[in-house]
Amino acid sequence: MEKTSKKMIGRRFEGKVAIVTASTQGIGFAIAYRLGLEGAAVVISSRKQKNVDEAVEKLKAQGIEVLGVVCHVSNSKQRKNLIDTTVKKYGKIDVVVSNAAANPSTDALLETQESVLDKIWEINVKASILLLQEAAPHLQKGSSVVLISSITGYQPPASMAMYGVTKTALLGLTKALAEEMAPYVRVNCVAPGFVPTNFADYLTRNEDIRNSLEEKTFLKRLGTTQDMASATAFLASDDASYITGETVVVAGGTPSRL
């Protein structure tokens, strides 16, 4: 777990409740950790109870108020339970970070099976909409939603084609939801560059690929989970109270134009 100095951050989420999906490792965990350090009661989720339990213990060890819930975002009953359990314990929701994603195939688009196309779309896009349908009635005035997209949404690479297409869709979804949920709820998006997590390990563990990715950035390095958490916390906080419908690309200067 990358360390964030408690002396360097404020308490922008004191008294607030934040749900972060797919948050027991990687970028999702870093986001939950950051929001928790800043005072939020964080609700973390993952498909596996073991992962949830381990992440809860790590966050509690840092003095963070945390609730862990098993949730596969493509399961309607588990989505509803995530929201209902949060509201039952805390009485409200202030922040929702939709981070869950899947990339089960490296096939070219025209060679990808229909069932795989459906799975990637369902988890990466559809689940965010359905989760917010459940959460919306409980969001407080001044609440914030942050969708996690990707730099691949701007130019989907061949090895992540359908994944990239779904991340492009999230850019549009951000705009649509921002208008629909205004004026009481803001909706923004973070598009991370490549970060060496378990999710991206098949790319970043290859030295040649990693070097190529680093060379495409102005800063000549890959991102960290802490980089993504900082940007997400900003957009979710009142510091971004006049920002909605926008995507912040956190990719070290990697070209990001549709």
Curated annotation (Swiss-Prot):
Keywords: Oxidoreductase. InterPro entries: NAD(P)-bd_dom_sf, Sc_DH/Rdtase_CS, SDR_fam. It is an enzyme of class 1 (oxidoreductase). Substrate binds at S150. Pfam families: adh_short_C2 (PF13561). NAD(+) binds at residues 19-43. SUPFAM superfamilies: NAD(P)-binding Rossmann-fold domains (SSF51735). Its EC number is 1.1.1.-. One of its GO terms (molecular function) is oxidoreductase activity. The active site is at Y163 (proton acceptor). PANTHER family: DEHYDROGENASE/REDUCTASE (SDR FAMILY) MEMBER 4, DEHYDROGENASE_REDUCTASE 4. NCBIfam families: PRK07231.1. Belongs to the short-chain dehydrogenases/reductases (SDR) family. Has no tropinone reductase activity. This is Tropinone reductase-like 3. It comes from Erythroxylum coca.
